[in-house]
Amino acid sequence: MPVLVLRQFVFVLPRALFGAVLAFVLSSGVHAQQDAPAGAGTAKTEVLWLGQASFRIRSPGGKTILVDPWLTGGPKTPARFKDLAALEKVDLLLVTHGHVDHLGDAPEIAKRYGTVLYGPADMITPLVTIGAVPANLTHRFNKSGSVTPLPGIKVTAVKAEHSSLIVWPNPATGKNESHPAGEAVGYIIQLENGFRIWHMGDTGLFGDMQFISEYYKPDLVLIPIGGNFTMDPEDAAYAMRNWIRAKYVVPIHYNSNPLAKGTLAGFEAAMKGAPVRLVPMSEGQAVEF
């Protein structure tokens, strides 16, 4: 049954006072949530940036989630993770769209670890058709679709304003082929303790960012700031100031492509005084939330 969590304290109140106290707590931003697995309520979420939009997330329940794993080809991938064996285990594999700096090593990781690759339906279908990944190691879903790939973990695909294309080196011809891959998405990843991460993938500004924030209530936002292909620092700061309400924001998708000139310093300047904690990360750094 639902419980009210207020740090680690338990208060015994007369029944007559309970309603008033509950109303006060809820109005202060504390939410009722479903019972979590044992230990998940106090465990931390570890977020490791692997460069560009690539992240490894270790959930409070000990699961390893990999998002947009551009590792062997990524110019900013930490040296250790150029070897896919360094991942050790992958319980959940998510890709936001088909561009190489997001799809990256996902097919190889799926096959190496026997992990199902979750992604937009129109990206997964051509990957299977061209033989990049077996059908039994894929799961197709789409914007507004939710899945529960692991106990206590829920993933919802949400809108991203971006394109998607798979470039595949055909071994039979030795030439690259381009395959349309539908539309890009972002992900709301809800972990065992209710902590929610919005990985925005690649996106420009769009007004429904406000709706996504209001409806899904993310705690942590991973937001692209590089510009040219995505929002630049000023765009991203506008979204965070005006549309998105979260506790933390981590800038991503910069410092890897010379065409994407947005900088951390530019984002920090544009975010000055914003009501959200900016958590700048360096490639290879892990932060607990």
Range-by-range predicted roles:
Residues 117, 131-149, 237-289:
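Binuclear metal-ion centers of metallo-dependent hydrolases, dominated by the metallo-beta-lactamase
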Residues 67-68, 90-98, 118-121, 197-203, ...:
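Active-site neighborhood of phospho(di)ester-bond hydrolases with catalytic His/Asp-centered motifs
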